[in-house]
């Protein structure tokens, strides 16, 4: 590793200094780094609610993977929905924040569901013949997720929140996964297998047309658009060390690295609605905790 060393004081839960660094050739963004949860509970894949007043995340703190909610600054977490099943993956709210889409094994195999927060009603929206995971909800009221049926080929699908009009929009060999909508709902960012075990970030229209790669080397995963649609946060491994949170412009250029814990895999970035912070999971020895990077004013 190359570059300068920086020390940031960790707030909320920890009272220690965490070393972070900048990589040679990638600009370093200064800001405040805050640990939101303690490791050991399997807290991961956080996403902000549309109003920015709370975070959704999945955690195994109750004995199985379930959906929780807490304030953006950390603190007590509340169970969102009681379930005897495991609810996995990133939770994506509807644009109005009244419903959530998520993955669960409640019917025996992973599928995508929609939860109405007022009534508590849960409805399956993905094809029961397919293993499905990782939904994201667009501003145009369309859900995208990735799915497979036997073998190792994984493709991205879209479906309406009522389960209608399901369409497979990628048709590549290998894996096309981890879709995330641009703020205007016109474009998907995807992680696409490049054939050697690593992934690149691709962009496509909502119907899968005009697909193209915007990264070329390394291993780039878990894209998440900024609220203004100008930048994308990713988890990337550019050498043989660990995954780091990077941000880039929507064409794959102007790459920056945020402050984050060192010697750990830092994954699943999510931008706040006001663009002022990014929350992510930092994992050491498979024990994840949620952290937040706040951009310098």
Residue locations for each model-derived region?
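N-terminal export signals
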Residues: 5-21
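Multi-bladed beta-propeller domains
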Residues: 24-42, 70-87, 104, 115-131, ...
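Beta-strand-rich domains and repeat architectures in extracellular enzymes and scaffolds
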Residues: 35-65
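Beta-strand C-termini and the immediately following turn/loop, strongest in propeller blades
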Residues: 37, 56-62, 81, 101-107, ...
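Blade-terminus and WD-like Trp-Asp/Gly-His loop motifs, strongest in beta-propeller folds
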Residues: 46-53, 91-99, 135-142, 179-187, ...
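Structural motif
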Residues: 64-68, 109-113, 152-157, 197-202, ...
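Blade-level signature of beta-propeller repeat domains, shared across WD40, Kelch, NHL, RCC1
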Residues: 270-297
């Amino acid at each position: 590793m190359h570059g300068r060393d920086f020390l940031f004081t960790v707030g909320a839960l920890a009272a220690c200094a965490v070393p972070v660094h900048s990589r040679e050739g990638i600009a370093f963004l200064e800001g405040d780094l805050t640990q939101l949860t303690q490791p050991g509970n399997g807290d991961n894949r956080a996403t902000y609610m549309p109003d920015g007043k709370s975070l959704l995340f999945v955690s195994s703190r109750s004995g199985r993977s379930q959906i929780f909610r807490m304030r953006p600054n950390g603190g007590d977490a509340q169970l969102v929905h009681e379930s005897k099943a495991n609810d996995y993956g990133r939770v994506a709210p509807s644009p109005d924040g009244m419903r959530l889409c998520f993955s669960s094994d409640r019917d025996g195999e992973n599928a995508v569901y929609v939860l109405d927060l007022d009534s508590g009603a849960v409805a399956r929206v993905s094809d029961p013949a397919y293993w499905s995971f990782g939904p994201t909800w667009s501003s145009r009221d369309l859900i995208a997720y990735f799915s497979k049926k036997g073998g190792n080929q994984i493709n991205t699908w879209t479906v309406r929140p009522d389960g209608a009009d399901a369409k497979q929009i990628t048709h590549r060999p290998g894996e096309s996964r981890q879709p995330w909508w641009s703020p205007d709902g016109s474009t998907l960012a995807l992680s696409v297998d490049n054939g050697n075990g690593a992934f690149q970030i691709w962009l496509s229209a909502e119907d899968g047309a005009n697909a193209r790669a915007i990264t070329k080397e390394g291993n780039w995963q878990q894209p998440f658009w900024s609220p203004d649609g100008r930048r994308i946060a990713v988890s990337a491994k550019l050498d043989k060390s660990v995954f780091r949170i990077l941000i880039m412009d929507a064409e794959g250029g102007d790459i920056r690295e945020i402050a984050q814990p060192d010697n750990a895999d830092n994954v699943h970035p999510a931008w706040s609605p006001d663009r002022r912070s990014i929350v992510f999971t930092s994992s050491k020895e498979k024990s994840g905790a949620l952290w937040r990077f706040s951009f310098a004013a």
